[in-house]
Amino acid sequence: GLFDVIKKVASVIGGL
C-alpha cells in the first residue's frame, strides 16, 4: 500500500 511506499522511501533516505 501507500504506507509501504513511504517506508521504502524512508529506508532509501536512511541509506544515504
Curated annotation (Swiss-Prot):
It is found in: Secreted. Keywords: Amidation, Amphibian defense peptide, Antibiotic, Antimicrobial, Immunity, Innate immunity, Secreted. Its main location: secreted. InterPro entries: Aurein_antimicrobial_peptide. Signal peptide: none annotated. Pfam families: Antimicrobial20. The modification Leucine amide is found at residue 16. One of its GO terms (biological process) is innate immune response. GO terms for cellular component: extracellular region. Bacteriostatic action for Gram-positive bacteria. Strongly inhibits the formation of NO by neuronal nitric oxide synthase (nNOS) at micromolar concentrations. Acts by a non-competitive mechanism, probably by binding to calcium/calmodulin and as a consequence blocking calmodulin attachment to nNOS. This is Citropin-1.1. It comes from Ranoidea citropa (Australian Blue Mountains tree frog).
